[in-house]
Amino acid sequence: MRTNLAVVVTAGGRIARADFLSSSLPEASAAAEDYAGEGRHVLIKALLKTGRRALLEIVLDAVRATGLAERTVIVGSAELQHWLNPPHETLVPELSEAHENLIAGLEAVKEYPRALYLTSDLPFVTADAIKRFVDACPPDAQLCYAIARREAFDARFPDSPSTYARLRDGEFVAGCAMMVEPAALLARAEWIRQVAQRRKSLWRLALLAGWHVLWKYATRQLRVADVERRAEQLL
């Protein structure tokens, strides 16, 4: 088993050019035509630019600057190969569903004891933020998931649309980063699929965790510690 850290970045997804041009993304522009993907009318989300850099480029630069990753796997289309630095950065072909892309990425790094999972749409990510998250994750934890308090998120990103979980401890927003033990999650691939299918509904996610968790969530009695304990039971 490898001892260093692997990184998995899921970079799938497309957006219609018309939808992108009508959006209100600040200072955003389409990626170069050479990397537009399936014709001029469809753009690869990971290659959309904020300022002068593609979203994927921002994430990869931050990962590289940490000096922590022995291997980085990017799950996406062939057009992304241009942005990678082999041999330590490799491309895994994307699949049709986001959770299948996560599973494919974990399969590629299953010999590592820990893998950092990131999405490619993190325009404000920095090497320091990644390092602090990695350092905060207990080395023996099978899953660490990034969350932030609503007041901190709103102060940093005012007017940004997001979904908040209202818990007894406060309101929280989910991050786009996880530290995982690949083998442990791969053994529960079906559970990952169910979580992914319900990811847009906090109620359905709570139901997946059991009626007791759902009741506590509905009555605003659920705490972060309760979620952690239930996750330990499920994993």
PLM feature spans:
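N-terminal nucleotide-binding beta1-loop-alpha1 segment
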Residues: 1-41
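Conserved N-terminal catalytic core of the sugar/cofactor nucleotidyltransferase
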Residues: 1-9, 13-17, 53-114, 127, ...
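Active-site acidic Asp-centered loop
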Residues: 118-120
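Short, well-formed alpha-helical segments that are part of the catalytic scaffolds
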Residues: 27-35, 45-64
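Conserved core of the sugar-phosphate nucleotidyltransferase
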Residues: 125-233
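Hydrophobic/basic alpha-helical segments enriched in Actinobacteria
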Residues: 43-46, 224-225
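Structural motif
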Residues: 8-10, 116, 145, 179
